[in-house]
C-alpha cells in the first residue's frame, strides 16, 4: 500500500532530493493520465506549504517581501537612514536634535516628549486614579504652586519694605528772575539794579549754602545774560572806565569766565571750602565800581601780569567812552557770581566825552600842511604829490615796552589811560 500524500509532501519538503538521485519510475507511470488521487495530493501539499512559514521562526511573511523593494524618498540629513513616510523621518530627526514638542498638559507636570505615542502613554499615568505616581505628582504640583505663591508674596513685601520713603518737596530752588528785560523795561539807576540783584542773588552769597549744581548753573546763566545786557546799556560807567584799554587783553586771558568757573565748580570740588580759600587770596572780585570793592591790583593776580591796572577797573568799556570802543559780546568776561557785591551803588551821571591830553586820532584836530584838494588844484603836475606823513616821535623803549601789547611795566607810576593817550 503506498504512503499517504500528506506524508510524502512533508518528507519531500524536509528532505529535498535531487532528481538524479531519485529512482526512475516506469515510463508508463509518467505517461499515464493524472488521476484524481494525484490532484488531491498536490492540493494538500500546497496547503501545507502555505501553513508552514508562519510556524517557522525567523521567516518573513510572503506579503512583506515586496515592501522591501519600495522606494525610501525621505532620507535623514544627519545620517544614512531613509524612510517611506515623512512623519517617520520627522520623528527620527528629533532623536538627533533633542526636540520634544509634545508637552504634558497635566497641571504641575513639566515632562515633554518627542513622539506623540510617548505622550499618550505618559498621560495614562495622570488619568489613572489608583496610580501611586499620579498621587505623588499631584502632591508635588500642589506644593510647587504653594511655594510659588509664597515667593511672590515675599517679593512683594520685600519690595514694599525696601522702597524709599516719599521724598520731601524741595523748598530751596533758584529764585525767579525779577529783572525786566532791557527791551521792555530796562532799569534806570544803579540802586534799582542793585535791589533786583539782591533779590535774585541774596541766597547765593559767598558763605551761604549752595543749591544743587543744576540750579547753580541755571542761576549763573541767568545772571550772566542779565549783567551782559545791563553793561551793553552803559550801567557800568565809573570815573576810571576809560582805563580798561591797557588791560583789556589781560582781562580776557586772566579773569575766570563765568561758564568755565561754573563747570569747574560742578565737576571738580563743588562742595569743598579749600577752593574758596584758594580763590580768597587770589581773586576777590566784587561788582565793578562798587565802593566796597576788594579786588586787588592785577600785578598780584598772576605772576606774569605786569599791567598797572588800578583796583577798581571795570570789566567793560562804556559805550560813550571818549577814546575807546566798547567791547564786543565775545570779548566780555564776567566775574565770579559768588564775588559780586550786593551793596547799593550810588547812581552816577553819564560821563561826557572830554579829551585828556593830546589825542592824535581826534578828527577835530587841524590838518598840518596842504590838503588833498589844494594838491590836486595845482597846475603843475610835478607838484601834485602827497607830503611825507608826520610820524609822532616815540622813543624806541616806549615802542618795545609791553604797554602796546596790553601789558605795561609794573614799575611805571603813570595812569594807564593818560599814559596811553600820550603815546598815541
UniProtKB/Swiss-Prot annotation:
GO cellular component: cytoplasm; nucleus
Amino acid composition bias (Low complexity), ranges on this chain: 21-38, 288-302, 406-416
Name of the molecule in the record: Probable DNA-binding protein creA
GO terms for MF: RNA polymerase II cis-regulatory region sequence-specific DNA binding; zinc ion binding
Post-translational modification: Ubiquitinated. Deubiquitinated by creB, probably to control its activity or amount.
Organism: Aspergillus fumigatus (strain ATCC MYA-4609 / CBS 101355 / FGSC A1100 / Af293)
Subunit and partners: Interacts with creB.
C2H2-type zinc finger span: 74-96, 102-126
Family, as annotated: Belongs to the creA/MIG C2H2-type zinc-finger protein family.
Localization terms from the record: Nucleus
Highest taxon of source: Eukaryota
Biased composition (Polar residues): 39-50
Biological processes, Gene Ontology terms: regulation of DNA-templated transcription
Keyword annotations from UniProtKB, A to Z: DNA-binding, Metal-binding, Nucleus, Repeat, Repressor, Transcription, Transcription regulation, Ubl conjugation, Zinc, Zinc-finger
Chief site of localization: nucleus
Lineage: Eukaryota, Fungi, Dikarya, Ascomycota, Pezizomycotina
